[in-house]
């Protein structure tokens, strides 16, 4: 099951300039691989638009519960304090096309 996550932070909370955000972001990124593995999640890709302070991530999770449990991990919740994130289930174009037949 694919999930699209968009996360935006303010320039003031950007980890490139905010010391506290940098510490929390460092902890989050250091634990991300073990946390995704713990919940059976594969990060398909993650992209950053630096001028917009926007991060876009696509994850492949076994189900919605796994994704929710991952997002409730303390390191994820701590980083969420510096940004506004939206996570939604998505389909590939090929999967969506089946509904149009």
Locate each region found by the language model.
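Conserved RNP beta-strands of RNA recognition motif
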Residues: 57
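Short, intrinsically disordered, mixed-charge
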Residues: 69-77
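Conserved short beta-strand edge segments in small beta-sheet-based binding/regulatory domains
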Residues: 78-92
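Short, conserved catalytic or adaptor-binding loops enriched in Gly and charged residues
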Residues: 34-36, 77-80
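Short S/T/G/P-rich N-terminal loop/turn motif that feeds into the first structured element of a domain
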Residues: 1-53, 62-69, 90-101
């Amino acid at each position: 099951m694919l999930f699209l996550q968009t996360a935006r932070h303010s320039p003031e909370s950007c980890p490139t300039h905010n010391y506290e955000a940098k510490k929390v972001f460092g902890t989050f990124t250091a634990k991300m691989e073990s946390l995704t593995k713990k919940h059976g999640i594969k990060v398909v890709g993650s992209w950053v638009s630096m001028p917009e302070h926007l991060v876009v991530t696509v994850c492949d999770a076994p189900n919605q519960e796994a994704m929710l449990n991952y997002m409730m991990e303390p390191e994820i919740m701590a980083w969420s304090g510096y940004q506004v994130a939206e996570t939604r289930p998505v389909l590939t174009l090929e999967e969506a096309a089946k509904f149009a037949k």
